[in-house]
Amino acid sequence: MVAFSALSGVSAVSLLLSLVQNAHGISLKVSTQGGNSSSPILYGFMFEDINHSGDGGIYGQMLQNPGLQGTAPNLTAWAAVGDATIAIDGDSPLTSAIPSTIKLNIADDATGAVGLTNEGYWGIPVDGSEFHSSFWIKGDYSGDITVRLVGNYTGTEYGSTTITHTSTADNFTQASVKFPTTKAPDGNVLYELTVDGSVAAGSSLNFGYLTLFGETYKSRENGLKPQLANVLDDMKGSFLRFPGGNNLEGNSAENRWKWNETIGDLWDRPGREGTWTYYNTDGLGLHEYFYWCEDLGLVPVLGVWDGFALESGGNTPLTGDALTPYIDDVLNELEYILGDTSTTYGAWRAANGQEEPWNLTMVEIGNEDMLGGGCESYAERFTAFYDAIHAAYPDLILIASTSEADCLPESMPEGSWVDYHDYSTPDGLVGQFNYFDNLNRSVPYFIGEYSRWEIDWPNMKGSVAEAVFMIGFERNSDVVKMAAYAPLLQLINSTQWTPDLIGYTQSPGDIFLSTSYYVQEMFSRNRGDTIKEVTSDSDFGPLYWVASSAGDSYYMKLANYGSETQDLTVSIPGTSTGKLTVLADSDPDAYNSDTQTLVTPSESTVQASNGTFTFSLPAWAVAVLAAN
């Protein structure tokens, strides 16, 4: 158990005692009869490659710019070692997708180790696991090749291996190595690949698509970093929306996320210029997203491109017959995902290593089509995609990318959902508390993105406001089916959006859990299947609540959006004991970051007297009482 920190002179011990003190204040009485059903997949994740959350983040490949991808290749992250220079070679393509390779020019009088280094994504996290590296090589050479992980400033070696390899000038050949490592104290580590300079003197060698992986989550090939995957698994989310987000849209039709260019061997994926200022390798592609869902037990929510690029980029929005090739492309993607091996695209999936179809039940058509000039044409575009997809796959749940009526068909198709996004101030989120009370119950809602914004790090005021917003939609989780905080992940060294749920650097174990992360974890891990009626002698504000049950277990979620302690009595007939989890700080501006961890949850066991729990909730607090 971690106690509260930095609480304006109130000791952690006295505060914890105050949580279970006898007090008389707001009375909450939970009905054990009846109730409304609550969505079993209410809490989950929205992911797109922003803030280097994919490349350089949860995706396990650690080398930056591994294949010199793109129409303007460069040597970012690469440097030469020893008596040699490196250059981009566009005349020695590895594949049609990787048209440029690194040419290593070795001096005539070279001796010792010569080769190249890669600095990773602002470092390489060497965690002490077994590492694996692969690379393609072309050129006349027969001799030793050494792969090392070495301190950038210290020269300390954290792992190495040497193999003997023979290559020719005619074709690329692939080499692969595995080697043990010792844990590095930080991320200031270089990947180094060298050959014997005395053997290769005066020659040149080409290297193509180099990779470096440590241990991956559940040992999945081309998989996720376990440190970040474990943090997500701790949240016990239920779904994953991918691949975006703005990064699905792209800046034009040509620049959109193309599913068929994210599958197969890494060196057959050209990558693309992402919409968040950096190139995406697409090593984290369609297969990897579905394996992510399998390995973390998540329901996949697939976003598909719908004829609209970010801010009406290129010649978008497309309408009428211009949509036909893109509708066909989505149908091909769905056949790839859902078709058996007798179908053209199902057979292609099997050839790429996935024999059985994936379990896809939900598809979202577009992203935020209410913005950037997309609204006026969205009803037409949504209908065109909906009709084609529904005709081919009538069991799929199809989700519109907005909930704004002006952008939607006059009558939504039966069974379709809408997507509601809300980035706001703390007061703005609290003001949305009862928004979902008055929804049309015939159209289910997906809250695809929400959070407090316009701040560097989530703080207590914002996180409590998010909890109020979450209590509001959980009270209505008969119609609000799913909700996801966004953005999810943030490499501290390269950030395009703040605040974010989880921060990290490349130092092993350097993961920063925000106050908002703990709110998400507390709410997601304590879920009932039925929302219970709660009667009170007080109105909502500054205290907010929702109660649910699953069998004999009851969950009361509370948020105190104010500077005063709230004394509570919570009555749940038939219960006798409970676990009280509280996240609080008397300073509404308190936050966790890469330099400080001020606020973490505290847990205590509480006893009921005749089914009634009595405790106090501190200022700026979020709490969950799990009782049985």
UniProtKB/Swiss-Prot annotation:
It catalyses: Hydrolysis of terminal non-reducing alpha-L-arabinofuranoside residues in alpha-L-arabinosides. It is found in: Secreted. GO terms for molecular function: alpha-L-arabinofuranosidase activity. Glycans are attached at N36, N51, N74, N152, N171, N260, N359, N440, N493, N610. Disulfide bonds: none annotated. SUPFAM superfamilies: (Trans)glycosidases (SSF51445), Glycosyl hydrolase domain (SSF51011). GO terms for biological process: arabinan catabolic process; arabinose metabolic process; hemicellulose catabolic process; L-arabinose metabolic process. Its EC number is 3.2.1.55. Keywords: Carbohydrate metabolism, Glycoprotein, Glycosidase, Hydrolase, Polysaccharide degradation, Secreted, Signal. Transmembrane segments: none annotated. Its main location: secreted. One of its GO terms (cellular component) is extracellular region. SMART domains: Alpha-L-AF_C. Alpha-L-arabinofuranosidase involved in the degradation of arabinoxylan, a major component of plant hemicellulose. Acts only on small linear 1,5-alpha-linked L-arabinofuranosyl oligosaccharides. PANTHER family: ALPHA-L-ARABINOFURANOSIDASE 1. Belongs to the glycosyl hydrolase 51 family. This is Probable alpha-L-arabinofuranosidase A. It comes from Aspergillus niger (strain ATCC MYA-4892 / CBS 513.88 / FGSC A1513). The lineage of its organism: Eukaryota, Fungi, Dikarya, Ascomycota, Pezizomycotina. The gene is abfA.
